[in-house]
Amino acid sequence: MLVVNNPLVLREQISLWRREGRSIAFVPTMGNLHQGHLTLVEQARSHAEKVVVSIFVNPMQFDKAEDLANYPRTLEEDCAALNAAGVDLVFTPTPEIMYPQGLASQTFVEVPGLSGLLEGALRPGHFRGVSTVVTKLFNLVQPDVACFGQKDYQQLALIRKMVADMAMPIEIVGVPTVRAEDGLALSSRNGYLTTAERALAPELARTMNWIAEQIEGGDHHLPSLVAQASQRLDNAGFRTDAIDIVDATTLESATDKSRHLVILMAAYLGKARLIDNRVVMLSA
């Protein structure tokens, strides 16, 4: 497995594979890898002959300097796991390499509409940072396929729209959320949980599933369901950040005609901000 941080070296290797007629799959990450990331790698391997993974803690998508500074960096362990998973190349650039003129002078990419909704409204600038860094990584790696987790539902929708709008010749593969046995969605941020908080954390998924069951059972008074779910989380020790039930395609408010919904959950438990989602299909 090659580990490189120089974009020129990366491009040389990509060009070599292209001359050999190899297909390339790409998995962008911020490191601190867990089984969810390795599942993305497995999916990537099934779609192409060569797999490239990037590890880059992207400062452009953090709205708090403290969060950026505290984000776990476990490069040695990550590379060992990726090597064992059969990855062909790991790209590990620094912020100075990715943004040589600094963030203030960096050209950015922004997807209108989706960038300002929901999570984007709570974290201004976050999705601008995501779309910019993903575009730059796509330009460097030039993959045929890129794999993203469905746990970050809005991010996946944003990447799909960006790729379509910009006519990028890349297939975007959404990979189902990987969960612990108790239902908690795997996330690098789970490492912020204390032992006691980790025991409480599955309540987020349980509450989400409760909402889905109510909707599927015929209760379509969504504001009431959101209020009850928020109270349920607060009673369990969470601090609810957002619960949204929206059209799964547009991510705009669901209407009486909406039949394809997604429940989007975000709540703090201690220092950790946990997110989850579930799609609900209603019969016509």
Curated annotation (Swiss-Prot):
**GO CC entries:** cytosol
> Pathway membership of this protein?
Cofactor biosynthesis; (R)-pantothenate biosynthesis; (R)-pantothenate from (R)-pantoate and beta-alanine: step 1/1
Q: Which residues form the active site?
A: H37 (proton donor)
Where in the cell does this protein reside?
Answer: Cytoplasm
Q: Which UniProt keywords apply?
A: ATP-binding, Cytoplasm, Ligase, Nucleotide-binding, Pantothenate biosynthesis
Q: Identify its protein family.
A: Belongs to the pantothenate synthetase family.
- What does it do? Catalyzes the condensation of pantoate with beta-alanine in an ATP-dependent reaction via a pantoyl-adenylate intermediate.
Q: What protein name is recorded for this chain?
A: Pantothenate synthetase
**Source lineage:** Bacteria, Pseudomonadati, Pseudomonadota, Gammaproteobacteria, Aeromonadales
